[in-house]
Amino acid sequence: MQHYDIIRMIGKGGMGEVYLAYDPICSRKVALKRIREDLSDNELLKKRFLREAKIAADLVHPGVVPVFTICSDSDLVYYTMPYIEGYTLKSLLKSVWQCDSLPKDLAEQTSVGTFLSIFHKICSTIEYVHSRGILHRDLKPDNILLGLFSEVVILDWGAALSKEMKEDVLLDLDIPMPGSMFSNMTVPGKIVGTPDYMAPERLRGAPASESTDIYALGVILYQMLTLSFPYRNKKGKKIHVPNHIISPEEVAPHREIPSFLSQVVMRALATDPKERYTSVQALKADIEQHLQGSPQWTPKIALHTQDAECWKFHESILLSKYFPMLEVSPALWYSLAISKIESFSEVRLEYTLLRKGLEGGFGILLPPSENVDHGDFYRGYGFWLHIKKNVLSVSLVRNGLEIQKTSGNIDVNQEKFFIAFEKQNHRLSLNIDHTVWMIHMDYLPGRGGRIGVIIQDITDVCGNIVVLESSGALHVSCLAVPDAFLNEKLYDRAITFYRRIVESFPGRKEGYEAQFRIGIAVLEKAAEEGDQEGFSQALREFSVLHDSVAAPLEYLGKALVYQRLEEYNEEVKSLLLALKRYGQRPEISRVRDHVVDRLHEALYSNHRVSLVFMLLALHVAPESINSSEEEHFLKNLQGKIHDTLFCSLDISPIDFRSSKMELLLSYWSGFTPFLPGLFQRSWDLKDYRALADIFYTAADLGEREFIDVYGNTLRENIQATTFTEDIVEIFPHQLIHFLSALDAIFLHAPVEKIFSDVDILDPVLIIYLFDLFAKDVLIHGKGEQILDAIQVLETYVSPQQRHTYLLPYEILAYLWMKEGKKVHELLSAHYDESFWIEDSHWAFVLYGYWLALTEESSLAYLHLSGCREDHVAPRALIGLFCSPLGICENQWSYQERRNLLLQKFIFFHCLGDDVERDNCRVAYDLLVKERLL
């Protein structure tokens, strides 16, 4: 264990202890589990402990914590794993047991719907584990970790066993340790596992099997649905086999448990193993069926691909013209066919495609009925499927933009694929070979009408495209008639009919939905006519829903209005109000889905608000972001990560689903409502480095109130806490001095006052303070003070830190003082000339400023405009400003716009253009004050 710095203990079990540790070689925090010292001499227990580690190391699945290292060579036997922030399912269940009323956030966390999503992930993990020939044998809520970002992880593989092995009696006996303080913890000969979660046959001494794991899953699902046990075996009493278990819907009628789910639980808990599910896969399939709300479908029409009578028109198109975001060759021609018939309000399309057709790409669309033959076929929703190198990708497209994408490996020998596309209620889904690949929710009145097909060779569709109607669609919604008027842009007639529905269904779902659609109709009319009063009327229509059962729709509607008006602060504020106030209302899911939809929309249009919606999505719908999207997002964020001080000072890589990523997004977007939550989370974890990062971010964004309130809270917490654990990073008392220095910066105190405690501060804190101080004095025309600060600080940081973090500001100070000779000396002495033309390097910008100060302005413009126009580093945005194409304001985040104004301020100062320089200062102060998203 000498390779790790132990931070604190985070868990203790019968055989092992788990510590939070720091791995200095890989620069990351890990969870280190070691065998207890009082058990370390027992070879049998060592063998069992190592068996647990090796089983976990052999399993590769998101639901199993991977093992980094296993150490069995020394007296201290241990292994390491990733450290995941979260809590156990047991702690969540325990927090609500026997509670008469629950807070909103806890009620949401323990709702039937939320628990089913978690249980589905548990089943997926155990299905994989069983496929590897492993039995867990001790499934229970204690051994299920719920991560802060929707991770669901199975823990504790100490009882796990390969199905091919016979149960090792010696390994599975619990050995009492005479003389140990834990000598009474076990009884020799006890069956491995937890009695409350053991199948009846297991309690009678039968060997473990997949069926006994399924029984344990049944007990867990029973607890999730009812918030109670199906039975309890009391400690000290003889273990009994339950004869009868009361159905979940009878035990907890207030939970409104569907009969189908009760049947699922009772089947999993069947006393006779033969009556249980035959596999976890079968159990998971029933859960999926319920989650998807699978309807009964009836075939209605068959579209013959070779029959011209089935199609309104059939022609060739250049696909890249209409779908520029798809990975298709701009020169490839595709066949487009649009059906004569219009699809039903709830429809399922079934067809079989040859592999060759998918290798070229295949699209299925629901274009609007109007103007479909005038080039508007790409409007509305559709799916695009494409095979490349045995990877099948599925993209959801809307109005020509790819808004969601997923992919997966396929069998290299598979030649045919069965595809099913469903549109039901507000849900669009795509199934491939009876497996769900993508689901998307859309709660706005649909514009789809006909069915469109895009493919290179229509003969690659095997047989017909079968159109099926849902049994639920036989009941026509009262909203269908006004929806039809809305689709035809007959706004006034649609509004009239919607109002009649509101009057006819007061206090009912239909009435609230009609009121919401009145707002949509008014909004669409205002947008089409450019009527500002119309937008105000739409806001008033949505306000009618205030404090009703459908209250989330008020704020969703208002967010749509503000989005059209490009008032993004108000848009995000509306969505936040809905999420905070009405987290338990049924309609809140529509707000969450809209957040995810806006994220994809903003990303693909390269809009600055994408950072805010990424942050919101991480909070309210993290499960909606898949691994390929994570990779794409991280790739796009690399420039910002590189230019973020708290990232560059921490060499460990940043995970997408982490508190640090939330802070990064808050920093660049200027969106700070989640800072209090990050503060509390970091304090609970005693992560003092993260607390320093948070206060640096708040100070940089000018959040004086946050620093005052939470700075005082931090001071009180530190003074009231006794610190016993080993601290490997920033010390708590240093944070108190850091906060005092932040206050001094806000008050524009002298250099000596700000850095009066520099001798007791960690270098990271010193660099944070210097960065904040330097930017503040630069924009306020006091750049020379940077040199005074460097003189005070340079002995307290390493030479490398001085070069990386102090030197650029030193050069900026001399630029402010217009000492061109000194600037050139520093550039020549510290930066290789190759860096002067590398636009990702500080020297590129500094050299451009020097040219502006000492040479013709045209040379400065020419040099700076040589930056790359794609993926430009935030520190070099001045280069885009100098380029002929200029800056697109909508693309840049709050922090990028702020950086650009500071860069322009220095640039114009070097050019001697004091008027433009002062205009930049005014604009900078206004931006900081208003902080528009």
Curated annotation (Swiss-Prot):
This is Serine/threonine-protein kinase PknD. It catalyses: L-seryl-[protein] + ATP = O-phospho-L-seryl-[protein] + ADP + H(+); L-threonyl-[protein] + ATP = O-phospho-L-threonyl-[protein] + ADP + H(+). Belongs to the protein kinase superfamily. Ser/Thr protein kinase family. Autophosphorylated on serine and threonine residues. It comes from the Bacteria. Its EC number is 2.7.11.1. It is an enzyme of class 2 (transferase). ATP binds at I10, G11, K12, G13, G14, M15, G16, E17, V18, K33. It comes from Chlamydia abortus (strain DSM 27085 / S26/3) (Chlamydophila abortus). Gene3D superfamilies: Phosphorylase Kinase, domain 1, Tetratricopeptide repeat domain, Transferase(Phosphotransferase) domain 1. PROSITE patterns: PROTEIN_KINASE_ATP, PROTEIN_KINASE_DOM, PROTEIN_KINASE_ST. Keywords: ATP-binding, Kinase, Nucleotide-binding, Phosphoprotein, Serine/threonine-protein kinase, Transferase. Residues 4-291 form the Protein kinase domain. Together with the serine/threonine kinase Pkn1, may play a role in the specific interactions with host proteins during intracellular growth. One of its GO terms (molecular function) is protein serine/threonine kinase activity. InterPro entries: Kinase-like_dom_sf, Prot_kinase_dom, Protein_kinase_ATP_BS, Ser/Thr_kinase_AS, Ser/Thr_kinase_PknD, TPR-like_helical_dom_sf.
